A protein has these predicted regions:
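Buried hydrophobic packing segments
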Residues: 41, 108-115, 130-140, 161-169, ...
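Secretory-pathway/luminal and periplasmic proteins that interact with or process carbohydrate-rich
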Residues: 64-65, 136-143, 189-197, 311-313
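Short acidic/histidine-centered micro-motifs embedded in hydrophobic/aromatic stretches
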Residues: 59, 129-133, 182-189, 305
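Amphipathic alpha-helical interface segments
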Residues: 107-109, 152-171, 181-254
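Terminal-appendage/accessory-domain detector
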Residues: 1-102, 203-213, 220-411
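Structural helix-adjacent loops and short alpha-helical linkers that scaffold large soluble proteins
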Residues: 118-130, 173-180, 228-231, 294
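Hydrophobic alpha-helical hairpins/lids featuring a short glycine-rich hinge
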Residues: 87-142
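Hydrophobic face of alpha-helices
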Residues: 30, 34, 38, 108, ...
Length: 411
C-alpha cells in the first residue's frame, strides 16, 4: 500500500514494530520492562506448588525442551507459555495498567521467556519483543476503556493475545505483512470470559498463558505466510465490535497516535497486594484507618465510594462479596480485602486462604461493608479509594487513597 492513510491499524502498528530499533526504546521503558520481568519471575516461583499449577502440568500430553522455572519437567513451547503465564497471574499479584486493567507481564514475560530459550535470543532481542508487545497491550486497553469488561470478557485474555503475537513476530523478524497477518490470525484465537467471578473458579488464572500461547501460534502461522485480516481491530467484525460493549465508542487514535514518541508501557504499575487491581486503594485506606481504631468490634458500618465500572466485578453480588466461597473469589471482593487490611494490616499471599475466608472476625467486618457509586470517581483513568468508617460511638473515620500505590501517581 502506497498511502499511509489507507493502512489499517494493525498494519500501522506492524510497520512501527518492524522498523523499531533497540536504541529507539527510552531507557526508562527498558527499566520498567526489566522490573516487570523480574517481578514475573518471582511470581512463577511463588505459585509453583499451587493446586492449579499441578492441575495444568498433569493435563499436558507432550514433552519438549523448554524450561519452566521451579519445575523439573521440560515442555513444548506453547505448554511452557501456558504454565508460565498461569503461574505469573495465578495469585493476582502481577503488574497492572492504569487506563483499563490489563496484566502485561503475565502474557509478555511468559511468551518471551520461552522464546528466549527456544531461539537462544540475545537480551536486546528479548527486550524489543517485550517492548512492542507491552506497548500494543497498553494502547489497545485505552481504545475503549471498560468496554471489554462490560461485554463479559477479560481484557488481559483478549488484548494479551495481540501483545504476545506481535512480540513473538518481532523476535521472528516477521515482515510487516506477516506481522499484520499474525495479528489478524490471533483475533480468532483470543478469548476469555469473566464468568469465573460467579463462583471464584480458576479460569481467569489461565487467561494470560492461553493468550501467550495463542500469540506464539499466530506469529508462527504468519511467519509461514498464513493470511489473516488486516482490519482485525477496526473492522465490522473486528475485536472491538465483537468483544466490547457497543455503547462505548472506540477511539483508534489511542492505538497509533504518538507511536514511538510516547510509551504507555512506562505507566505499568507494580501491585502492593495479592488481589484485584481496584481493591488495592481500598486496602490502603483500611490499613491507614486501622491505626485509629482501638477495637475492630467498635465498627458499626463502612461505606465505600466507588467507580461505577468496578461494581459488577468487585462488589456484586454483594452477598458473595461479603462471604467469598473460595480464596480466589476473595481476591476480587472489596469487602473482604478491606476486612483483611483492617484485621491484618496487610494483604499478601497468606491472607487469601481457606482458613481466612472462614475467619469469623474477618467475615463479621465484611458484613458491615457497603458501597455508594461516586459520579466523580475517575475510574478507569485513575484508581482511587475512599472509605468512611462509622463507629458505635458515632465517630466517623474517613480515609482516602488518591491513586494506586506502585502506579504513576505513587510509584
Amino acid at each position: 500500500r502506497d498511502r499511509f492513510d489507507d493502512l489499517g491499524n494493525a498494519e500501522i502498528f506492524s510497520t512501527w514494530c518492524f522498523n523499531l530499533e533497540y536504541k529507539e526504546i527510552p531507557n526508562e521503558v527498558i527499566d520498567k520492562i526489566k522490573l516487570i520481568f523480574m517481578d514475573s519471575l518471582g511470581l512463577i516461583f511463588a505459585s509453583r506448588n499451587e493446586d492449579y499449577i499441578k492441575a495444568i502440568k498433569q493435563s499436558f500430553t507432550d514433552s519438549g525442551n523448554c524450561t519452566v522455572p521451579g519445575h523439573l519437567e521440560k515442555l513444548c513451547p506453547s505448554d511452557a507459555i501456558v504454565l508460565n503465564g498461569t503461574a505469573i497471574h495465578g495469585e493476582d499479584f502481577d503488574d497492572t495498567f492504569e487506563g483499563t486493567p490489563v496484566h502485561v507481564g503475565s502474557v509478555m514475560c511468559s511468551s518471551l521467556l520461552t522464546a528466549a530459550e527456544y531461539y537462544k535470543l540475545k537480551p536486546k532481542e528479548i527486550l524489543k519483543g517485550l517492548a512492542v508487545g507491552s506497548e500494543l497491550m497498553c494502547r489497545l486497553a485505552l481504545v475503549s476503556p471498560m468496554a471489554i469488561h462490560k461485554q463479559g470478557f477479560h481484557p488481559t485474555a483478549i488484548l494479551g493475545a495481540f501483545g504476545a503475537s506481535i512480540g513473538i513476530s518481532k523476535i521472528l523478524k516477521n515482515s510487516v505483512l506477516q506481522t499484520t497477518s499474525s495479528l489478524g490470525i490471533v483475533g480468532s484465537m483470543a478469548s476469555g470470559i469473566i464468568e469465573y467471578l460467579a463462583e471464584g473458579t480458576w479460569t481467569k488464572r489461565l487467561h494470560p498463558g492461553w493468550a501467550g500461547a495463542s500469540g506464539w501460534k499466530s506469529a508462527h502461522l504468519g511467519k509461514n505466510n498464513f493470511k489473516g485480516p488486516r482490519t482485525v481491530f477496526e473492522g465490522k467484525n473486528g475485536i472491538f465490535n465483537s468483544f466490547a460493549d457497543s455503547k462505548i465508542i472506540p477511539d483508534f487514535k489511542k492505538l497509533t497516535d504518538d507511536l514511538g514518541s510516547y510509551w504507555h508501557t512506562n505507566n505499568l504499575a507494580i501491585k502492593p497486594f495479592a488481589c484485584g487491581t481496584m481493591t488495592q486503594p481500598f486496602i490502603d485506606c483500611a490499613i491507614k484507618a486501622r491505626e485509629k481504631i482501638n477495637d475492630l468490634n467498635e465498627i458499626k458500618s463502612i461505606i465505600c465510594k466507588v467507580g461505577e465500572g468496578t461494581v459488577h466485578r468487585l462488589w456484586e453480588p454483594l452477598s458473595e462479596k461479603r462471604k467469598p466461597t473460595t480464596p480466589y473469589s476473595a481476591k476480587f471482593s472489596v469487602p473482604f480485602c478491606i476486612a483483611v487490611g483492617l484485621y491484618f494490616g496487610k494483604a499478601g499471599l497468606l491472607e487469601f486462604t481457606e482458613e481466612q475466608i472462614k475467619n469469623r472476625e474477618i467475615l463479621n467486618i465484611c458484613s458491615k461493608i457497603s458501597y455508594e457509586i461516586d459520579p466523580q470517581n475517575e475510574y478507569p483513568k485513575n484508581y482511587s479509594g475512599e472509605i468512611n468508617i462509622i463507629l458505635r460511638n458515632s465517630r466517623v473515620i474517613q480515609e482516602t487513597q488518591p491513586g494506586l500505590r506502585g502506579g504513576k501517581l505513587f510509584p
